[in-house]
Each structure stands twice: as structure tokens, then as C-alpha cells.
Amino acid sequence: MMNHFLIREKFLNFFKKNNHTIVSSSSLIPNDSSVLLTTAGMQQFKPYYLGDLDPIADFGSKNTASIQKCFRTSDIDEVGDETHLTFFEMLGNFSFGGYFKKEAISLAYEFLTKELNLNIEYVTVFDPKKVDANDWRKNVPEDKESFEIWKSLGISEDKIKKEGVDNFWGPTGSEGPCGPTTEIYIKNKNNQNVEIWNIVFNEYFCDTGQNLTKLKTAGVDTGMGLERLLMICQNAPTIFETDLFDSILKILPQNLPLKVKRIIADHLKGSVFLISDGVRPSNKEAGYVLRKILRRVIVYEHLYNFNQDVFVNIIDQIIQIYGKIYSNLNSDKNIIFDEIFKEKEKFEKTLKIGIKELEKIKEINSSDAFYLYETFGLPYEIIKELGKEKAENLNYLDFQKELEKHKVVSRQGQEKKFGGHGLVLDTGELKAGSKEEIQKVIRLHTATHLLQQALREVLGEKVRQAGSDINAKRMRFDFAFDR
């Protein structure tokens, strides 16, 4: 069985042999201030796609490959099922005018079928006939070239599926590079088809009016999740039965629900990497993400009353698994422990008060649940578990409605107090020091709403705001999108 070390080695050696410069993973905290965390392998190469930097000068090649640390906040609430993670690693090869479709597809095919001996179940390519008539991508030509390349490699026509907008990637904002994609699917142990590799051909620039023009230099951007690939190569039923998770899950008490085990393993792993890359628990930006996942784990520890040594052993095991790949985890070990246990000590005081409040309530309704959540950080599932009979009539839909109602009330209160824009001087989201700056911030605040609406029109209703930071000079808008 191939372990994760061997797969990493095979991937990097394969692309090095095929004239790619191997580039180390960048930090989870990107240099790009427009995003909160690193979510894909291409992020550190964005300036090269845009022509702002020269890959020859920096890498000695127009082709690179990397294994990138990634963290996606959009999946936090889904962690615990068979497929979702917050922290993961992405294998990728990239080209900034060095090669295009034929080479990109051929390299992917060779690596999967020859190096890893895997069988491709089917692939997908872009076809505008599958796109709605009024969609801005309707006039993009069918990707016949990719279709023919796959055929030439021995993939039969019935296994080359033509898809619509799901096979067109980008732009990542209101404008930028974009293009058709081809995706590779392989069957897992459960006989399910798993998308294993996505190859994006950035050949267009899309402006804010959704007009497409050909890029001067076309680029290739590919991504393949290491955890998914391990699941396939190790014939595991889920991503959690691979050697990146097995030894961690075995440390946890056996009486814990499987979902809880997975959440704890994922969230502590994410915490270790975020702290090592400089994030500290706080109420803002990446620090808030770290605080949220850490506190969720702390609540489960309290709920199931397992020994604190379990925490220590899991963190040790995570560092042991990844320390040979990311040596800074070893040197940062004391910092990682200090930050996690400082946050643990701080939150446990609030948690105890919250549980006492819960015990005072005779019958917990959605309003009570929201109060416990908002004031003491008790998640819905913990309220249900601790409340037992007192919470038997509480359901998640009512709890969600209470959350939405609170958002509406908050917005109305802000509008009444601050002239309809919800602005205060330095709230942590919107920052202004004078009336003149307030007017500038108001305009940028309005722009975030317009941007979000535009994103939804282009990418779909799944776009969700994940945060923003606005001052008189600039704005940052973070959003989550399930692709």
C-alpha cells in the first residue's frame, strides 16, 4: 500500500522529471489581502498568471508543481461526514505559457495510470450546448480539443462526458482569468465516482460586464486533493481511513460518535497548521476561524469528559505525521501547545457558566438556544445533547430561523443608529476616523453588497460572504464558494 510519503514523492519526482520546478507550499496566510486564507494551490502563482511577475526569473521555468497547504472555511459545518475537511493539501502543476491542453491532459493521464496504476472511470469536458441560453458562457466554443486528446489516450467516447458551467472555471472575482476545465473521475472502494483531478485552461479574461477576451498567454492550473487521492490509492472507504487520519482517530476514546471523532481530528489538525503559520485565536479574520474550530473541540471534550492527555497525544501525533514534511511544526511545537491550551483555559470558564445557564432553563426553545449560542458559544448540537429531555422539542430549523431573525434585528438597529449603513468608528469590520472617512467607507461598504450580488449572478446562489474588512482606503471581501 502506498503511504502519503510515497505518493508525495511520486508526484513531485514525476513533474520534476517532466521539466517542472518544484515550489514549496506557501503559508496558509496569503500575501493576497483580498482573501482570508490560502484555499488552492494556484494562489501563490496568481501574479504569474496575470503577467505581473516573470516565472523564468523566479523559478527558471514557465512550469511549476507544488503540494500546497489549504484551509477552506466554507466546509466547517460539514466536517464529520465522509468527504469534507477544513485543512487539506492540494497537489498541483501549473504552467504560465509553457504548455497547454495536450501536455496538461497527457501528464495527468500518465501520472494516474502509469505511476499510480489507477483506472480512470470517466472524464468531463466543456460543451456550451449544456449551458443556458442566456448564460455569459454560452458563446464559448466547445472544448473539442480536450475531447480529442482524451480519445487519443485511449479513453472511449462514452467515457468522455460533456458538461456545462460546471466545466468552466472562473473568474474568481468580478473579473479575471477563466476558462474551460476537464475533470477526471475514479471509482472509490464504495463504487462511487470521485472527482480526483481538475485541470483548468485559463485562456480568457472576463471583465465586469462578463465580456470575454483571449488572454495574451494561456495558462494551466490543476488541483488534486491529496486526501482524496490517498483514499483511492489505499482503497479506503473514506478520507478518514487513510494514513493521514488513522493513527489520530485511534487515540480518541472508542465510545465517541464517529462524526465527533472526525471533527476533533480535522479541527485540531487545522489548528496546528494555522498556529504554525502565525494565526492566533481572536475575534477577527483568520483568528476567529481558529477560535471557532478550537472551541468546538473543547466543547466536545467537556461533553464526553475525556482525559486532557488525549488532546496532547493528538497534537503530538499530528506533528509526528507532518513534521517530516513541514519541519516548522517541530520547531513551533511549544508555541502550538501554548496557544491551544491558553484558548482552552480561557473558553472553559465561559463554557462552565453557559452550561449552568442551560441547566436553569426548564424547557429549551429556539430563543433560549440562540441565547446560549450567542452568549456562551454553545453549538446547537451540544445544546441538544446537554439539554436532553429539556431540548427534545428544539429543532435545527427553528434555531436557524432565530439566527436569521437576529441578523435582521441587528441590521435594523444599525440603520436606525448610523443612518442606514450600519457603520461605526472602528468596529473591526468598518474603520473610519472622521465624517469624511465615514462617507468613503459608506461607498466601499455599498460596493461589498454589489460585489456579493455580482458574484451570485456569475457563480450562483451558493456564494456566501465569509467576512470583510473596510477602511477609508480599501475594502476586502471574503466569500465561500463550493468549488
PLM regions with names:
Residues 1-483:
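A glycine- and charged-residue-rich anion-binding loop/surface
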